[in-house]
């Protein structure tokens, strides 16, 4: 879909649903309801780093400043890019064609709220009265182009109960800066107030807006602003640094919930929207390992919790992700949702709760599954646990052992590996690629226990799982090491980077997006904004020496050593606060030294081994993901150029 439509879909989802952390591709998990992923960071380092001389051979080492090292990496990347300009342009043109072909699958979403319908048109948020919706009588409520905010994107929208105000959350595409803009709706909408650093917000009454403030990537305070009296007041403060606070209004608008969540535990407080000035009331005190969410209807609280045994629901064989469509009319008896897979564009369904009837609403020329096979496998890990794998390949492919294979892994925070639809996946399938998704421990595919068995002192389980998955794929004839590439992002970089050190012979190349590669130094620095919050995932090496040694045993940065490495391509934003550039420069610096040391010490039998490419692509700005559709397209084109080149593949199709 077009960028503006894509953002509007997410915005309106947030309008009526839980606050979804801004990720590249959100999906609804079917087993455990854990907190949306909060990204992480690596440790800054001193303004000097040891790097090798830029000459061809191994030279004496010298000190480089941070700026010198960054300049050196930018020069190296520019040289790589200039060598493959034609390849990159061909791939970009093909990508654009695929994006345009599948962007029209999801039309502009129209949401009914009370007597109005709200929708996006030409980058503006608009509304019409229900009786005038077909007559073209449209009010433009909000247009970012009229505001002095450069490179800001709309993240969230809330409409006041009487439709007199609209609160719009915006976030910079190049940093963590955010704000809430409150517009008074009249014949000529007027900006009533701008509140900086706002993360989440909800209307309790026609005039009272509750909101959270984000400081150093953390939300721990809740305020309200009374537009009738023009005053604000602090309502709630979370004292525990492991917890992140957001707001949600129940679908019947009776209660506003203050949700304080850590990686494994939650606590919910209620504010009665009929009496918004009364103190919040706790639902249930936090219990370690229990996450819960509260809804309300007809004087009953409905609590969705992870306490107890999970329940699984079967989907069609091809489906890999499920996303609920927002529906403000909570009394509706019809539920709308989307099913998709990495190679199947989203298909819209309607389910009647009264008639127990499922209707497919999306028209398809021909199901993708006809030309693409999905295979479900299980690999036996080191401790004999069976690990699921999902593989996609072209239906008529032969000699699969000689086809390129791109393996995806994540394995952290109880979050599933991303299996949402991406147009570039279809292009890869057309070119004969196979796509494999490894559902390793540490993720959430098989529930909370699956996550717990792959975090803190069990992180090695996820690494062993990944190794077992790759070995099984090769054993069954799905490609071979010389045609295998590994891809991950953010915290998934821990497992990918660990395998890169422990079993480099299993892959030919690796592509990482804003990866977390220095776990130990990050978790040893309590002054970084998210270190305390991350302790439930990685442990606390500050007070536990055994934890420190355990992290050191798998940390990608700590375990770089002279050996034959696969080629690697890393993308990072220059001002990314969650994964600072300085940490990745240090990683690249150490990796280059290990590669050079190994080249110098190679035996006669090893002289024929090709030197790996080590490339760092530093993007401007501070976004943890690509800041725009064009940026994303360019990044994917360059990353695919790297993969096609490293695996010796032709880009001319």
Language model features with spans:
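Beta-propeller folds
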Residues: 2-317, 418, 422, 603, ...
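Structured, non-catalytic alpha/beta "coupling" segments that mediate domain-domain communication
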Residues: 107-108, 113-123, 330-361, 517
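A structural signal for short secondary-structure junctions
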Residues: 295, 308-309, 327-331, 342-343, ...
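Flexible loop/turn segments at secondary-structure boundaries
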Residues: 218, 242, 264-266, 277, ...
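Generic beta-strand/beta-sheet core signal
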Residues: 183, 212, 259, 271, ...
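Cap/lid segment of the alpha/beta-hydrolase catalytic domain
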Residues: 146-150, 155, 362-485, 489, ...
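Active-site-proximal cap/loop segments of hydrolase catalytic domains
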Residues: 440-653
């Amino acid at each position: 879909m077009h960028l503006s439509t894509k953002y509007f879909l997410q915005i309106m989802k947030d309008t009526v649903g839980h606050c979804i952390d801004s990720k590249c591709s959100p999906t609804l998990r079917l087993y455990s309801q854990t907190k949306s992923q909060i990204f992480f960071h690596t440790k800054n380092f001193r303004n000097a780093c040891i790097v090798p001389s830029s000459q061809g051979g191994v030279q004496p080492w010298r000190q480089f400043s941070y700026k010198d090292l960054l300049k050196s990496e930018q020069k190296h990347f520019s040289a790589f890019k200039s060598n493959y300009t034609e390849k990159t342009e061909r791939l970009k043109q093909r990508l654009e064609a695929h994006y345009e072909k599948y962007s029209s699958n999801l039309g502009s979403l129209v949401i009914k709220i009370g007597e109005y319908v709200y929708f996006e048109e030409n980058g503006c948020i608009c509304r019409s009265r229900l009786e005038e919706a077909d007559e073209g009588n449209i009010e433009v409520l909000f247009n970012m182009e009229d505001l002095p905010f450069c490179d800001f994107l709309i993240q969230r929208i809330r409409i006041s109960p009487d439709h007199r105000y609209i609160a719009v959350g915006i976030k910079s595409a190049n940093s963590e800066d955010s704000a809430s803009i409150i517009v008074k709706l009249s014949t000529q909408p007027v900006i009533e107030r701008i509140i900086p650093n706002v993360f989440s917000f909800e209307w309790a009454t026609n005039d009272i807006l509750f909101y959270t403030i984000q400081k150093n990537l953390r939300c721990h305070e809740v305020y309200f602003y009374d537009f009738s009296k023009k005053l604000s007041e602090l309502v709630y403060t979370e004292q525990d640094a492991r917890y992140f606070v957001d707001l949600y209004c129940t679908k019947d608008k009776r209660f506003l919930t203050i949700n304080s969540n850590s990686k494994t535990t939650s606590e919910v407080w209620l504010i009665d929207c009929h009496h918004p000035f009364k103190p919040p009331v706790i639902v249930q005190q936090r219990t370690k390992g229990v996450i819960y969410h509260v809804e309300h209807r007809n004087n009953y609280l409905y609590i969705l919790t992870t306490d107890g045994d999970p329940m699984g629901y079967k989907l069609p064989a091809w489906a890999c992700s499920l996303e609920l469509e927002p529906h403000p009319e909570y009394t509706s008896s019809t539920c709308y949702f989307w099913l998709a897979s990495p190679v199947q564009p989203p298909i819209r369904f309607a389910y009647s709760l009264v008639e127990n009837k499922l209707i497919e609403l999306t028209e398809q020329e021909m199901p993708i599954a006809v030309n693409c096979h999905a295979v479900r496998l299980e690999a036996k890990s080191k401790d004999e646990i069976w690990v699921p794998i999902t593989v996609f390949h072209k239906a008529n492919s032969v000699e699969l052992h000689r086809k390129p294979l791109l393996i995806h892994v994540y394995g952290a925070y109880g979050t599933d590996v991303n299996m949402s639809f991406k147009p570039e996946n279809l292009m890869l399938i057309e070119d004969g690629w196979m796509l494999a998704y490894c559902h390793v421990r540490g993720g959430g595919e098989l529930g909370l226990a699956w996550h717990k068995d792959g975090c803190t002192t069990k992180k090695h389980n996820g690494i062993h799982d990944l190794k077992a998955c790759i070995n099984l794929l090769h054993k069954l004839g799905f490609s071979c090491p010389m045609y295998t590439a590994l891809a991950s992002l953010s915290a998934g970089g821990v497992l990918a980077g660990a395998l890169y050190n422990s079993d480099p012979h299993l892959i030919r190349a690796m592509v990482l997006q804003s990866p977390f590669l220095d776990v130990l130094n990050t978790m040893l620095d309590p002054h970084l904004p998210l270190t305390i919050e991350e302790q439930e995932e990685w442990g606390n090496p500050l007070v536990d020496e055994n934890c420190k040694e355990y992290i050191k045993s798998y940390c990608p940065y700590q375990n770089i050593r002279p050996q034959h490495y696969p080629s690697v391509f890393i993308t990072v934003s220059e001002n990314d606060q969650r994964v600072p550039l300085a940490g990745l420069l240090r990683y690249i610096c150490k990796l280059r030294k290990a590669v050079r040391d190994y080249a110098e010490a190679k035996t006669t039998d090893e002289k024929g081994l090709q030197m790996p490419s080590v490339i760092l692509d530093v993007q401007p700005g501070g976004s943890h993901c690509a800041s725009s559709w064009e940026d994303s397209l360019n990044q994917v084109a360059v990353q695919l150029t790297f993969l096609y080149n490293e695996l010796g593949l032709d880009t001319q199709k």
